[in-house]
Amino acid sequence: TIPLTQLNDTTKSALSYAALANSQLSCKPGDIVIALGDPLGYGSSIGYGILTSTTTEINGIDHNYTLLTTDIYGSANANGILINKNGKVVGLINQSFNKPEHKTLISAVGITELTKLIENLCNDVKRPHMGVSVTNVSSLAMRYYNVPMGAYIIDIEMDSAAMKGGIHKGDVITAMNGAVVTSVLDYELDLGECAPGDEITVTIMRPNDDTY
């Protein structure tokens, strides 16, 4: 890589930005992908292969992501980007979510879920933080275990706003500031409407024996 400060204006004007693909809609198993950057553990390396999975969910704090896995062999410490055959970025390489038996296969976090975060970082926008990891409630859980529709809390960050507010692991978020929450996406969108320091009302349903 070369610092932009070392490039003259003519060279800079000839450069073009990489377009971002919609990784949620355009990626499917079998698609050809290219790993660029440092996939092999040393600078300016490249890898070529196909996507093997596009539906693995990563449950992060306050936001979920999609893990794109490939059959490209690389380094356990790889980094860089994953592009499709049209040259559009579909993901950022991240090996930390790989299973031990797949530690040298290149994986990436889908770019679509990262776009808003990248925009916020570029514009120095502070993101609200509640401190919960959530997942969608499956139809089977609703049918057989009477779990209500909403964002099911699978983990809580220590000393977070959620923990201090009395929210527990196993609770289901069903509304935020009066807006109904039926999924992880609803939760993320509603939280994104808030600003750091805002006081919000969170409606939860808590398990009590065999009901909520």
Q: What residues fall within each predicted segment?
A:
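Beta-strand/loop subdomains of soluble extracytoplasmic proteins
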Residues: 28-34, 38, 43-57, 66, ...
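Active-site-proximal beta-strands of protease catalytic cores
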Residues: 26-39, 70, 79-100, 108, ...
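PDZ-domain C-terminal substructure recognizer with occasional recognition of PDZ-binding tails
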Residues: 116-128, 141, 159, 168, ...
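C-terminal cap/linker of serine protease catalytic domains
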Residues: 89-146, 211
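Active-site region of chymotrypsin-like
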Residues: 3-19, 46-105, 149-154
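PDZ/PDZ-like domain segments forming the peptide/carboxylate-binding groove
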Residues: 16-21, 71-76, 80-81, 133-175, ...
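Conserved active-site neighborhood of the chymotrypsin/trypsin-like protease fold
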Residues: 1-42, 76, 181-184, 201, ...
